[in-house]
Amino acid sequence: MCIRDSLAKYVASQTDVEIIAWKGICMVHDQFNEKEIHDIREKNPGIKIIAHPECPPEVIKASDFAGSTGGMIDYVKNNQPQKVMMVTECSMSDNIQVENPNVEFIRPCNLCPHMKKITLPKILDCLENETGEIIMDKETIEKARIPVERMAAIGR
C-alpha cells in the first residue's frame, strides 16, 4: 500500500499493514498544528476536536477522535457534542451543521483551492460535452486496474 506520509503514519498505527509512504502532504490538513488545537481547547472548554487522519500525527494525538470524512460525520451524528471543531477543510463543517443544527461548530478555515475547482457546472459540462478526458498509456492502465477494481468492489 502506498499513501501520503501523514495518512500512512495514521493507518500504520491502526493496523498491522506495512505502509510505504511517499513524501507528500495534503496542503489543507498539514496547515494544522498542535498549538492551534491546545489554543482552541483553552478558549472553548469542553469542545470535542475531531481530526482527519491526513493531519500531522501530533494534531491527531491532541484530538478527541480521528477518522475519515465519513467517520467524522458519524461521530458528530452519533455523539451530538455541544461544541466541536473539525480539523479538516472548512466547508465540511458547513455541510455537517445543516444536519446537526444543535451542534456548535468552531471553524478553523483552511480552504482547498483544488477542491474548489470542481463545480456542478463544470461536471455538467464534462458529462454533456465529454470534455476533460484523461488519456493514459496501456501500462499505466493495467497497473491501476486492480486497485481501482478493489475500490469499486468496496462500494458495492
Regions found by a protein language model. Give the residues of each.
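Short glycine-rich phosphate-binding loop at a beta-alpha junction
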Residues: 48, 84-85
